[in-house]
Every structure is written in structure tokens, then in C-alpha cells.
Amino acid sequence: MAQKIIRVGDIEIANDKPMVLFGGMNVLESRDMAMQVCEEYVKVTEKLGIPYVFKASFDKANRSSVTSYRGPGLEEGMRIFQDIKQAFGVPIITDVHEPEQAAVVAEVCDIIQLPAFLSRQTDLVVAMAKTGAVINIKKAQFLAPQEMKHILNKCVEAGNDQLILCERGSSFGYNNLVVDMLGFGIMKQFEYPVFFDVTHALQMPGGRADSAGGRRAQVLDLAKAGISQSLAGLFLEAHPDPDNAKCDGPCALRLDKLEPFLAQLKQLDELVKSFPTVETA
């Protein structure tokens, strides 16, 4: 099965290419912390030879509580992203929540992300597609993997086939998510690159009084399971002090564990992609 290649600068993204990392922090907490986090990712990915795109949100529009930290907002967020690009020369991915934000974000960021909760919002999907930017489509927790085809079709009908699919877990009763490993193969049949958001797959939505809980201790186990499916890449969030992070700390990898974590996943990715295809249908 031919796999579509998406290019972001010098990076080639495809299910049969070396693993690409979309990595960073959940939300921009400050310019200095964003610089610190990106610097560590750049250092580690350059050492390991992993193609890298920096990830952070400028606004978390779907927090559990009205008092929860949301981020610096659109204007300040774009300024921070521009500073990061200038300092480190890395591509950037961030999420868009409203149609009016799409064009503004696409002027600065190399990949724009369609949030899982909003992935069926046609006006937002079309506005993002019309920017011509590469789009990372998060699979909603309530969607079957085969339903992602409808979102792909909306983008293509709007004139954009520069698309990536991203698994982030499925609702499993209340306050819990599970990852259906069979879903990766279903989405790969669409021939677009498929990523695994291991961070948010670890969430326990509403698991704490006013925010989501998480299962950080299992991040390596779940990441290995995902990468074993021969994917285009991994989506990962890390933090210098996860216990005090302003959003999704319970799911975030400790930043000082980034190198040993990625070293194992790179070896696994290389091993899996060295195997010949076996037709089992």
C-alpha cells in the first residue's frame, strides 16, 4: 500500500519513514520555560537523529474548570513561537480552536492542529484546510477510527491534502481512555501519516476535582505499544516539573527523562520498520 509523504521543511513524514517527533509542552506557561523545553528537545533529538517539530498550545479552550490556566493567548503565543523559530530553527505545531484563528496561526506555524473535541466542526475544518497548511487531525475520543475518513474528505474537498491523522485514545466509560491498537491499521489504510499522542492517551478525563488526571508512570509502555505499529511519529509532552505544570501534568514526561525515553523508542521504530511486509488478509 503506497503511503503518502507529507513534507515540513526538510522533514519527510510517512508511515514507512523514520519516526518524527511532535514534542514540547502542553501549554505555553512562559517564554522562558518554552525556550528551556525546546532547547532540551532540540539537544536530545539532534543527538539521537530524530526529526523534530516543537509543540505547545497558546490557548487551552476546553479546560475542566473556568478558573484553570488557559495560556497567553493568540498574539503573545505567536510572538513566543516566532522567538522559538528564530532561536532554534525548528518547525512548530499548535492547535486552532476557532475558524478566525486559522489564517493567523498558519502564518507563523508550520503545522496547525485540529483538536479532538472539535474534529467534526465543519466550519473550523474548512477554515484550517483553506490555509494550505499541513493539518494534524486529532481523532476524537468518541469517533471510531474509520470515521476519520469523513474529516479527511472535508479537508480534501476544501483543497488541502496535506494531512496527518493522530490517535489519542477512546472513551472507555467515565473518566477513562483506552487505545485500540487495531485502529492504527484502519487509519493507515487511508494512506496518510498516522501519529500517536501518547500523552493524552494517558489522561483520566475529569479524574480530579477540577482537572484531568493521568498515568505518567505508564507512558513508556504505551509509547512502545504505539510505535510497534509502524507509525509516522509520536506526539509527546514533557515538563521540567510535571507535578506543578499548569495543564496535564499527570500525563507529562519529566523533561530530564527525555533522552532515555526517546532512545528506546527510536530503536524500536528502526526495528519494526526493518521487517518485511507480511500479507495476512
UniProtKB/Swiss-Prot annotation:
Intracellular or extracellular location(s): Cytoplasm
GO MF annotation list: 3-deoxy-8-phosphooctulonate synthase activity
Keywords in alphabetical order: Cytoplasm, Lipopolysaccharide biosynthesis, Transferase
GO biological process: keto-3-deoxy-D-manno-octulosonic acid biosynthetic process
EC numbers: 2.5.1.55
Keyword Hydrolase listed: no
Keyword Thylakoid assigned: no
Classification via Gene3D superfamilies: Aldolase class I (3.20.20.70)
Disulfide pattern: none
GO CC, any one term: cytoplasm
Source organism, top-level taxon: Bacteria
SUPFAM superfamilies in alphabetical order: Aldolase (SSF51569)
Pathway participation: Carbohydrate biosynthesis; 3-deoxy-D-manno-octulosonate biosynthesis; 3-deoxy-D-manno-octulosonate from D-ribulose 5-phosphate: step 2/3; Bacterial outer membrane biogenesis; lipopolysaccharide biosynthesis
Catalytic reaction(s) noted: D-arabinose 5-phosphate + phosphoenolpyruvate + H2O = 3-deoxy-alpha-D-manno-2-octulosonate-8-phosphate + phosphate
This protein's name: 2-dehydro-3-deoxyphosphooctonate aldolase
Gene that produces this protein: kdsA
